[in-house]
């Protein structure tokens, strides 16, 4: 199952023009959960009810986002400092819809307020169908190492499914998280950036014990082109090429001369130009 980008419930309410794109789902994506964020129980419940007939198998609530503009608006991981308000939001949403409500949160807001276990119990009491736990505090952002033991503690404290998140970059990481925490599922985030092969490799490794090789240079090149073509079809060539600049940093991470390649792509404005650059640079590798 995949999850949409997080979408502001208020933005949907006020018909922000960007929300339509964020809520869009292609049938080829398979099961998709839509992720909302917000702190107003009435608005969150109303929007959940409004979109529940959409192409989503579940509605997820982001209570773990560490970005300052979200936190300063008392949304995302700020709600970990206000579990009473979080409880109101989740209770209202569960009552408003028939589809499963899930919630993602962190270890805590900072090292002085590690409350993931209590937060999970609260969410379970509200009637949520599952929780996803990221093993870092909001204060950490993505620095340091994810604490998988907090995921284990949450798993032992609740009966609903627990999804582990944080520092899963390889199939071996995925297996180790399952073994060390007992979690019911794994959420891969940053580990998939520039590495869409990770899902197939994790699944194969867990099912067979065999570790599939990583992608070849030509497979990476072909995937970059495929990604660029799909973005172009979806957003238009100009926007697609601009967005591909950041994706290229992930696709080429660790490659020889990757810095030069990333510098050159900043000058690329067309899909044809991208193909020519990749042909020149990646064939040379």
Residue spans of the language-model regions?
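Alpha/beta catalytic cores of nucleotide-metabolism and tRNA/nucleoside-modifying enzymes
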Residues: 88-91, 96-98, 112-130, 142, ...
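Hydrophobic faces of well-ordered beta-strands that scaffold small-molecule active sites
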Residues: 2-4, 32-36, 59, 101-105, ...
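Non-cysteine beta-strand/loop elements that form the S-adenosyl-L-methionine
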Residues: 4, 58-66, 125-135, 188-191
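Conserved radical SAM core fold
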Residues: 7-13, 41, 63-77, 133-140
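Active-site glycine- and acidic-residue-rich loops that bind
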Residues: 42-43, 84, 105-118
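Glycine-rich, positively charged N-terminal anion/phosphate-binding segment
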Residues: 1-57
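Active-site-proximal loop/turn and secondary-structure-junction residues that shape catalytic pockets
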Residues: 8, 38, 65-67, 101, ...
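Glycine-rich tight-turn/loop motif centered on a GG-T
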Residues: 68-85, 136-148, 208-213
